[in-house]
Design a protein with these regions (language model features):
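A structural boundary/capping signal
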Residues: 1-95
Length: 95
């Protein structure tokens, strides 16, 4: 399945929460792993545009602002990641 189809499939079932980019990213990475056995990474840092703590997904070495897509917002970026997690590391540390 191509990248856009994976994103569209996820977004068709996902209901995002305002100001919770980490949840959008976590659920997308979880979906990719459980439904398609695709590994992706959660990236946390200060966003370039909004200048807030923010999360994006790194899928095949390409950053994806899944939260902005889910919310219908302009995509943001993280230039200097503070943390990069795979799904297993994130779940082990946070749940």
């Amino acid at each position: 399945m191509d990248r856009q189809k994976l994103i569209d499939e996820f977004l068709s079932k996902f209901k995002p929460k305002k100001d919770q980019s980490w949840k959008s990213c976590y659920f997308f990475v979880h979906h990719l792993k459980k439904e398609h056995n695709i590994d992706a990474h959660l990236v946390e840092g200060i966003s370039r545009i909004a200048k807030v703590d923010y999360w994006i997904v790194k899928l095949n070495d390409i950053d994806e602002d899944i939260h902005a897509k889910a919310m219908g917002l302009t995509p943001d970026f993280i230039d200097k990641p503070e943390l990069i997690w795979n799904l297993e590391e994130f779940e082990k540390d946070n749940f």
